[in-house]
Amino acid sequence: MNMTATIQLKGKDFLTLADYSKEEIEYLLHLAVELKEKQQNGERYTPLSGKTLAMIFEKPSTRTRVSFEVGMVQLGGHALHLSSRDLQIGRGETIADTARVLSEYVDAIMIRTFEHEKVEELAHYATIPVINGLTDDDHPCQALADLLTIYEVKGKLQGLKLAYIGDGNNMAHALMLAAAKVGMHCAVASPKGYEPKEAVVKEAKQIANESGATIVVTNDPYEAIADADVVYTDVWASMGQEAEANERMHVFAPFQVNEALVQQAKQDFMFLHCLPAHRGEEVTEGVIDGVRSYIFQQAGNRLHAQKALLVSLL
């Protein structure tokens, strides 16, 4: 499908999938498939020659840094890594000034930080595209790669059921919004008190009403996973929650994705995890290393989904 003529994303920010239409998301996914094929065929494609992406990391990352940096290089551009040591954003210099200064030097900014408001403020003052590489509230780049992986394996998105089992964190938020946008049913199972934010659930349900999807939040993992096409989990204690790790281990134990739980999913279910994984905690080795697991294809798709983003926005 060639939708290049109809969809124009140049100069747009990528802060959350809620800001993108179903058609725009599908366009990015089809472009990612094309770019992945070019890469696999050894075809050089360098539309971003002479372009620079500034990557701001207030939270360290393996996949986000490597995939964005490699993606920019493969597209003919350059990526600049800025840690919180290099850039005292919002402390020494205001976010507004940082945004304006970087806009004079580079062609886009990718930021991975804690507060979602920081990304929104950066985007407000920057005159170049800003990409959300992760916040405490959202992880749209990962969700885009997840949609790509599901599409590759299942051949469609509309009407599938995704079950997310675990902490109602940024990943749960991103997946609910992503599923709602593309017409995929999403059931989230979290322990009491660890559910996704009510405002995000409400927003996802409103989007789902338009796309024909359903969004369900429950405290019962068996209810959520029933007849699921896609089973997804994440770590029980995210970065910054180390102090709560022991308590969370106890609370989340019944939410482990194990052989007994996945028997309730469809026989041809696919297992996804945004990684890093704690084997034996949120998921058993049998499931994560089993034949239904697509976690490395999923991790690889961060590169291709983000390349589609970069080509479209820059």
Curated annotation (Swiss-Prot):
Its main location: cytoplasm. Pathway: Amino-acid biosynthesis; L-arginine biosynthesis; L-arginine from L-ornithine and carbamoyl phosphate: step 1/3. L-ornithine binds at residues 170, 234, 238-239. Pfam families: OTCace (PF00185), OTCace_N (PF02729). Signal peptide: none annotated. Keywords: Amino-acid biosynthesis, Arginine biosynthesis, Cytoplasm, Transferase. This is Ornithine carbamoyltransferase. The gene is argF.
